[in-house]
Regions:
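Glycine-rich catalytic cores of cysteine/serine-nucleophile enzymes that process amide/ester linkages
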Residues: 21-26, 38-114
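A short, compositionally biased domain-edge/stem linker segment
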Residues: 27-34
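Hydrophobic helical h-region of N-terminal Sec-dependent signal peptides
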Residues: 6-10
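Generic ordered-secondary-structure signal
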Residues: 36, 76, 86, 133-141
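Positively charged n-region of N-terminal signal peptides that target proteins for export
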Residues: 1-4
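Active-site nucleophile-His-acid catalytic modules used for acyl/amide transfer and hydrolysis
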Residues: 101-146
Length: 146
């Protein structure tokens, strides 16, 4: 029984090691976001993709993308833990035409999509919430809030 336990732990541990390299993992668009060049309505979308490496067994990385009416780009908001280790804020904000990129090899799923006047009304509330996010400069995987 002891040998079986050691074998199972070894297999589990080795399978947790990935041959994927975050530097070469796909970050291309999944093709599920509306093109801001042709979609003029306001848009709010929330995406989730498996976290990188073994973390993907237990967690997803989520991010919010907002595009005000007639905007040429989306603003993406996400919390990224590795940024804190480099002296940067965990909260990341950037502009893009493709908010639906793979999360280091993991294809995102769109878990919320809202367009039109309702989205336009909520975007300022999201921007305000982001600007007041209390954990913008810190990150803890467990127990959260990130």
């Amino acid at each position: 029984m002891k040998t079986l336990c050691i074998l199972l732990v070894s297999v589990f541990s080795l399978s947790a090691c990935t041959t994927k390299d975050w530097r070469t993992a796909s970050r291309e668009s999944a093709g599920i976001a509306a093109d801001p060049a042709t979609e003029k309505q306001a848009i709010i979308e929330v995406y989730a993709a498996d976290a990188f490496s073994w973390r993907g067994w237990f967690a997803v990385h989520t991010w919010i993308a907002v595009k005000p009416e007639n905007a040429a780009t989306y603003t993406v908001y996400e919390v990224v833990g590795w940024r804190v280790k480099r002296g940067l804020p965990a909260l990341r904000e950037y502009q893009t035409t493709t908010p639906d990129t793979y999360w280091y090899g993991a294809r995102p799923e769109k878990i919320l999509s809202m367009k039109g006047p309702k989205a336009a009304k909520l975007i300022p509330d999201i921007q305000k919430a982001v600007s007041h996010y209390p954990w913008a400069n810190e990150y803890t995987l467990f127990p959260g809030p990130n």
